[in-house]
Amino acid sequence: MAEVGKAEVRVDAFDKATGRTKYYEDLMPRDALYVRIKHATIAHGFVKSVDTSAAVKVLTCFDVPEHPFPTAGHPWSMDPGHQDVADRHLLNRHVRYYGDDVAVVIAENEVAAMQGVRALQVEYEELPFVLDVQKAMEPGAP
């Protein structure tokens, strides 16, 4: 406990106090676009449609080519026996969990991107789901 009660020397304090420290926003190019993702509001189902009329142009799961990609914890392999994420895409028509990504709004600023996401109206075909691991392993479980 030799550190308790001692003053901490902050090597970056002067630069922060004088405004010289570079933060994330300082490093953004002036013409950078902002992205916000629309997340599913159901636990399981399919996206039937996305009404983008309230936003100028929004990418949805129907606009993005179906190119599978590896996700964290799921390395991609050329071996067909090890391609367990062949149905995973950037945006998903098949919703597998609450919060799954279904659309992307790209805008000139963060506020417009957030407003665009809020304006999207997604219609779903809801499917049954289970919340219990044991029930999920039963034959015929969704």
Please identify what each model-predicted range represents.
Residues M1-P142:
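Flexible, low-hydrophobicity surface segments
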